[in-house]
Amino acid sequence: MRTGTCRRARIVSVPTDAAHFRTPALPHSPLSDPFGRAPDDGSVFSPHIEFSRAEWARLRGSTPLTLSHDDLEALHSAEEHVSMDEVMEVYLPLSRLLNLYVAATQQLFRVTDTFLGSPAAKVPYVVAIAGSVAGGKSTTARILQALLARWPDHPKVDLVTTDGFLFPNAVLEERGIMHRKGFPESYDVRRLIRFLAEVKSGSEEVRAPVYSHLVYDIIPGELVVRRPDILILEGLNVLQTGGTAGERPPRVFVSDFFDFSIYIDACEADLEGWYLQRFQRLRETAFRDPESFFHQYAVGMSEQEAMEFGRQVWATINAVNLRENIEPSRERARLILDKAKDHRVERVWLRKL
């Protein structure tokens, strides 16, 4: 991974041409330990295999490109323009891998059915996407949803974000943690676990609450999930396992329900830059809506004042959450996408089974 001014924990990995050999121990980052376990002899065993972009792109095989330029335009965000090359070299190999994993899981279900002598209810394959604010989780989720749904067997792919499982603002205000919105304690984790438990039990319909970024709160209505083949769950802290402060650690974790997990990784300085770009764009667009929770930052502040506020939000909320909760969970991901300053994925880490 990049070093120098790039502030993030370092990934220790095994090169693709030496996947079963030890790699030299690397210095620990001040943010978190390197991946793998350090044996007594000072070397490191890594659970991840590292791929350069070119190496990963070759794993596409003969997977056809099923997205048009118009399709792609509708999927990426204003801050993150994803090129067709990015889709072909990064996301097509990933969709191929996921398709193989889903097929293998379905075969395992058939074997179990044969053993039990009776068919079981179809259980969705759950893919989790984690990472920092402004890291590109939503764009990755939408692109994967579109690619997976276009496979020859046309699986049904649903997308749910954990924003809907935030406590309503009234609850956050009552508990005095409105300033901690996005931190683990601001989520109704029990409700999220119940939702995933129902999904994985094969329930016909499972309902999730709806969150509005315009009003910055939970709104009336429900998102109904009806037994998809694949469910993509996108959120900041989905890979975390620790309990919140003052609470007993849960016996069941959100990640217990995942079949595959992806972490979007980037330098903290780049993440901050992307966040401020997004803040500026929203100030010029959505924040101008009188119904917007952040309307005051579009009309009641100068540009300099608003951007200073954005930098303060990053430093006191988003960066703290990244260092304390989000980045430490990275090593639990099955696959890590390492982004450069221009949002291009430069390297990929895949956990060995």
Model-predicted regions and their roles:
Residues P30, S46-V126:
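Extreme N-terminal, non-catalytic leader segments
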Residues A146-D158:
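Post-Walker A helix-loop "phosphate-sensing" segment adjacent to the P-loop in P-loop NTPases
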